A protein has these predicted regions:
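Internal maturation/activation junctions in enzymes
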Residues: 205, 273, 325-464, 619-620
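Bacterial N-terminal signal peptides that target proteins for export
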Residues: 1-13
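Extended C-terminal subregions enriched in glycine
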Residues: 455, 498, 517-520, 552-553, ...
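Bacterial N-terminal signal peptides
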Residues: 10-22
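Noncatalytic scaffold domains of N-terminal-nucleophile
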Residues: 27-41, 45, 53-238, 243-245, ...
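Active-site Gly/Thr loop motif
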Residues: 269-296, 391-440, 488-524, 528
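Active-site rim segments in enzyme catalytic domains, especially the processed small/beta chain
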Residues: 66-89, 93-95, 262-276, 430, ...
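Alpha-helical support elements that line or immediately flank enzyme active sites
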Residues: 46-47, 134-142, 238-245, 250, ...
Length: 650
């Protein structure tokens, strides 16, 4: 029977062999690390056929949007860090593509105030203008231009070509996993508010065991997405304008402004497409310089504001000191002093994140209510000297209280702004008092993947809908202008990424209040790591919302300080402290959180941490989903790490 579990089981065996064969051919072709074997397979096909890491990354991204529709796709956006190595007299190139969603032009600083978390996260209000398709198109244009100039090798791949594997999988379907069903079950109540969302997903079983790899064949575990296939085919045929200006744009705006639900608590969004404002048509990606830092002689290249790379660099800077000799006696892997210091660094760096990180383009001009506000202090936040000042607050004998105040990185800018120095602390009006729209989402609400090709080009790409299943709304077409040749476009989930904005009333919310056209702050931290000699060492990143910088921090330290393989580092227990006070929207986040078995910290370690004053609780589920590639410093051999928390380690 077409699409039967038996036929898919055979296909799965072939897929496993294909992925293994690709792994054995790594020295010739490169590698992809992603959260789903189909995405790895299609990305590595590109590499095996002579494609470059950028081309493989876009194919991988498109497939992930089909097989992980709850985590990413054309309804969201993200950040890609690219490295093109030196060739002859041509210097290495490194850049970031920023496709973070933007707020509609009608967004206002008070748009989320007084609302419940569910009103913000579910429905139209937190839907931002998605950037994924423009990102993919622009990345492939850059790749083709570099190939034309002789700077890059590859397949001269177009967006239409890159979308074909995703179209085929959406049309023919794939077998969902037990992980997919578990994630779906946590969001059934949200999805049930929208008949079109329920229709797409609710024919799947409710028992995760029914779709586990070892379960008997079950056709009900097979998911097809014909509307998404039609939409991707239309984009492949007509280009991104059909999404940002044409019938797909009409369908998006109609879905956002008129949510298809009977629930009176669901709010409409502010996205427009009319004579006055056309939010989708105004969207554009940003090509930015990466931010860089060092750790133990290694160089980090990552995505700066509005992404989370600055927080990651600050975390590593804080612990990079002779007081904390990670990897030696007393500071070994998951020992008390090691974990204690890392928790304290998280409190300090996360306080700074909420005070100073936002959309850098909007930070260039002070708002009327804050005329003395300087630009985002990126140099200060990533300065080792500033980290030393923050580090001085850490005591090995006891823990810092939660709700740590931010420091004053302005004084470490070059030159520092006169209004910020020589004061050594920020005034109350400048502190990051921040009623951030923090979801209670405990699972992976994003996806990350890494790619490296045989030419040495590397890509780290994190992309997101924000919460799992984003806004919970599937785009549908119920107006005449969004029908094309008798087919109605849609079939994909929209983000709720505007929940990344702050909604505090304090003047301290200086950089991250909602504004029209603005990108909300993000914690996505796709990262490249280079050895002291300059050779590539890691391509890594993670899903996990606000926990992402802390997760990537732990993985990098586990590899560099403790000699772990990339798979061991990704599979290791995790902990995070986001320096948030207990409140109606952040219950529990003021604690240091760790995971359930088999990823949990030992009870002995938890007891020791509590004796130092740390409040430690165990999450009800795991958090984060990291993917990475390690390059052996001696042989150049590649190894892949995939996260078992979301079905990885295959």
């Amino acid at each position: 029977m077409k699409g039967s579990k038996f036929s898919v089981l055979i296909a799965g065996l072939v897929l496993a062999v294909t992925v293994l064969a690709a792994s054995l051919a790594l020295a010739q072709s490169g590698m992809v690390a992603a959260a789903h074997p189909l995405a790895i397979q299609e990305g590595e096909k590109v590499l095996l056929n002579g494609g470059n890491a950028i081309e493989a990354a876009i194919v991988t991204a498109a497939v992930l949007g089909v097989v992980e529709p709850y985590a990413s796709g054309i309804g969201g956006g993200g950040f890609m860090v690219v490295h093109i190595p030196q060739a002859g007299d041509q210097l290495a190139q490194r850049f970031v593509i920023d496709s973070r969603v933007t707020a509609p032009q009608d967004a206002t600083p008070d748009m989320f105030r007084g609302l419940t978390l569910d009103q913000i996260d579910t429905g139209g209000l937190a839907v931002g203008v998605p950037g994924a398709l423009k990102h993919w198109d622009e990345a492939l244009k850059i790749s083709r231009e570099l190939q034309l100039s002789g700077r890059l090798q590859g397949l001269n791949m177009t967006l239409s070509q890159a979308l074909q594997p995703a179209i085929e999988i959406a049309r023919n379907g794939f077998d969902v996993s037990d992980t997919f069903i578990r994630i779906l079950n946590t969001h059934r109540n949200r999805l049930a508010k929208f008949p079109d969302s329920a229709a797409l997903f609710f024919d799947l079983p409710t028992d995760p065991a029914a779709c586990a790899p070892e379960a008997p064949p079950l056709p009900a575990c097979h998911l097809t997405q014909p509307a998404l296939a039609d939409t991707l085919e239309l984009v492949a045929a007509q280009g991104t304008d059909v999404f940002y200006r044409g019938p797909i744009a009409d369908a998006i705006v109609d879905t956002v402004r008129h949510p298809k639900t009977d629930d009176p608590n669901i709010l409409s969004g502010r996205m427009r497409k009319d004579d006055g404002v056309d939010d989708l048509a105004l969207y554009d990606i940003k090509r930015r310089d990466p931010v860089t830092g060092t750790y133990k002689g290694f160089t980090l290249v990552t995505a700066g504001p509005p992404a989370g790379g600055v927080t990651l660099i600050e975390l590593l800077n804080i612990v990079d000191d002779q007081r904390f000799p990670f990897g030696t006696a007393g500071f070994r892997f998951l020992e008390l002093d090691t974990v204690h210091v890392m928790i304290e660094a998280m409190k300090l760096s996360y306080a700074d994140k909420r005070a100073f990180i936002g959309d850098p383009d909007f930070a260039l001009v002070p708002p009327p209510g804050d005329p003395d506000r300087p630009p985002i202090p990126i140099t200060g936040l990533t300065s080792p000297a500033y980290a030393a000042e923050r580090r001085s607050l850490i005591d090995l004998a006891t823990s810092l209280p939660v709700e740590q105040d931010p420091g004053n990185p302005y004084c470490f800018e070059t030159p520092p702004p006169p209004s910020a120095c020589p004061s050594t602390s920020l005034s109350q009006a400048s502190k990051g008092v921040d009623e951030e729209v923090v979801t209670l989402e405990e699972e992976s609400s994003t996806t990350h993947f890494s790619a490296i090709d045989s030419f040495g080009n590397m890509v780290a790409y994190t992309t997101s809908l924000s919460s799992l299943f984003g806004s919970a709304m599937v785009v549908t077409c119920e107006i005449a202008t969004c029908a094309v040749e008798g087919r109605r476009v849609g079939g994909f989930l929209l983000n709720n990424s505007l929940n990344g904005f702050s909604r505090g009333t304090s003047p301290g919310v200086r950089y991250n209040a909602p504004e029209g056209g603005k990108r909300p702050r993000s914690d996505m931290s796709p990262t490249l790591v280079f050895s002291p000699s300059g050779t590539p060492r890691l391509v890594v990143g993670a899903a996990g919302g606000g926990r992402i910088p802390a997760i990537v921090f732990q993985i990098i330290s586990d590899v560099i300080d403790h000699g772990k393989s990339i798979q061991q580092a990704i599979s290791a227990p995790r902990f995070v402290n986001e320096n948030l006070a207990q409140s109606a929207t952040t219950i529990g986040h003021h604690n240091t959180r760790h995971e359930t078995p088999p990823f949990n910290l030992s009870q002995t370690l938890v007891t020791e941490l509590r004796a130092r004053g740390q409040t430690v609780i165990r999450n009800t589920v795991t958090f984060g989903a990291a993917q990475g590639i390690a390059i052996d410093p001696d042989t150049g051999a590649l190894s892949r790490g995939t996260d078992p928390r979301r079905g990885g380690d295959f």
